[in-house]
Structures are given as structure tokens and as C-alpha cells.
């Protein structure tokens, strides 16, 4: 299957003036905010925008001589994506500004964003999804029990700030994973004058929202401009509620790993579309929702705090830390589990069991589909037997 990198090779020479902004461009710019442009791209109102080609050169000069590890679940293809963007006429002259990267491990706050001046009369405000930090993942889980998490509030403030910095310019908002949720939240809760300037909002496998958010007038006003894209075995993107229609796309991965945007199949200026998410993804969604809805908001918050207390008992600050010394981490986690009360421990083990079973079922379902596809292809390619 072709992916984002292939798209940059095949269509990177086509300017936006002749080939308009599309859903694949959106995902590329959503992934771009995972790059650490600190010291390269100015913050909001802090200086002139930097051409993407120059920013890429400065980034690779800064990281020269050392491997670029994006983290356990952040795609390691992102630096290569940046390299190809810098060589592509479609992207290299785009301007970057408004880079923000905020992390507070004590308060479980993680927020990062980047503004791209696309050159077609619109900006793309790219909100970073959940990164490698445990604080970021904890805030992600808080989406299920809090009316507003800190990153959502910061996303609204960021959108207002960049709208003031670029008056009368049309806006696109987007992100991958939690970044997609932040993009929609910012679009819904920004001032009406700013919302009227929004051309589109892109949620790439981002979690949804509580029911009461979907019925708000400001969400209804924006609904037709929200584009939600999920892979065929989506789990993250099916969490909570989506009022808007969503597009299902094919992926080269199986199970939970389909969350990786670099696994999404690209054809021409769009993704390879499917009719619906898989049956196992639907069952996983139902099982997770049923489990979550069985807990009060207070119980959910206590569960999240306990779960991350167990992970942090290993001394890890990131998923990479957990992976680097997994033997030590597992020992610390097991000891921390024993210290939990039985009710919390049972809830945590049940949640892990649901995820494990669901991922296994979705993986097996995907492998079965691939096998059937291969067999059909062989049958179609087999020459007919001539009759004697």
C-alpha cells in the first residue's frame, strides 16, 4: 500500500494553486507538529515565519550525528517525511510560525501546536497528538471524565492568538489522535468571529466528545466543516461520541497499530476508503463504552490516577523509559499493583484484558481478510484450463 511518503514522492511537485488542498495534505501537516521545532520556529507573535525548507535544514543540522527517536508510539517516519516535504515544491515554501511545546508532568498537561501558512490563502493550525510522555497519555484518558482538560483550553487560546496574528486569513484546524480532538474543541469554543473564518477542521483518528458538547449551537454551526477520518480497526477515534459523519480508510497495519497515520493507504489525492470500520472494531467500541459508562466520573478519575500511579512507580516519565528498562519497570508495576485496593486493581486488570482481547481479535480479523484477498487475487490470476 502507498502511504504519506509515497504521496510526497508522487504529488509533491504539484502546487496548491493547481491541485487544491486535500485530506492527505491535512494528515501530513497534522503529523508535522510532532517535530521539535524549538529554537527554530518562533512562538506566537515572537517573530517572522520561517520557510519550511529552512526550518527543516535547521532541524537536521541540530540533530546531526545522533539518531532521531520520536518515541514508542510516535511514527519514526516523521523526520523522513519532513526531509521529503523540504524537497517538494508543494510544501517547501510554506511558512511555519507559532510553535508551542508545553509539558507539566505534575499537572499531567501536554500541549504542542504549530501554524503553517499554506500559501493558498489559509493557515493550518496543527495540534500535536499524544506524544511519548506519560503526562500526555494521562491527560488523554482524562477526556473520558473531565468536562475540559487543560490542553483543550490551551487549544482555544492558541487559535484565538493565531487568528489575531493573521487577521482576515481563512483557517484550517487539524491534528492526529488527541490533536484531532483539540482541533475540533478549538473550532467549537473559539469566538464566533474566528469560527466564521474556519474553512475546515480535521480530526485524524481523534477521540470524540461527551453528548452535551455535540448538541451545543456552536458545534452544530461547525459540524458540516468537520472531517473525521478513522482507520478500519479504529479504537482511539471511536472513543466517546461523534455527531459528524466519519470517513473510514484502509491501513497496512492490524489492530491497534492502525492508529499510525503512516499505515493509512493513499491513492492519488486521497485515502483508500472503505464502507465501515470492521465488526471487531465495533465490538471493541461497544465493550469499552459499556465498561466506561459503568463507572461514575469520580470512579473514572480515580481509576486513571491509580493506573498512572502504577506506571509512574517504575520511575518512568515516558513510554520510551518504560521500554528501555522493561524488566525493572515490570517489577515496579507488579509491586505497585499489589498496593492498590482490590476494586481498583480488578478494574485496571479488566481494562487491560478488554484492550488485549480486542487487539487480538482485530488482528486475527485483519489477517483473515488479507488471506482471503490474496486467495481471491490468485484465483483471478489463474489462467483458465483449456478443454481437450
Regions found by a protein language model. Give the residues of each.
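Alpha/beta hydrolase fold serine-hydrolase catalytic domain that processes acyl esters and thioesters
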Residues: 1-25, 29-93, 98-123, 127-157, ...
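Gly/Ala-rich beta-loop-alpha elbow adjacent to hydrolase catalytic centers
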Residues: 174-179, 183
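Short glycine-enriched nucleophile-adjacent loop
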Residues: 183-192
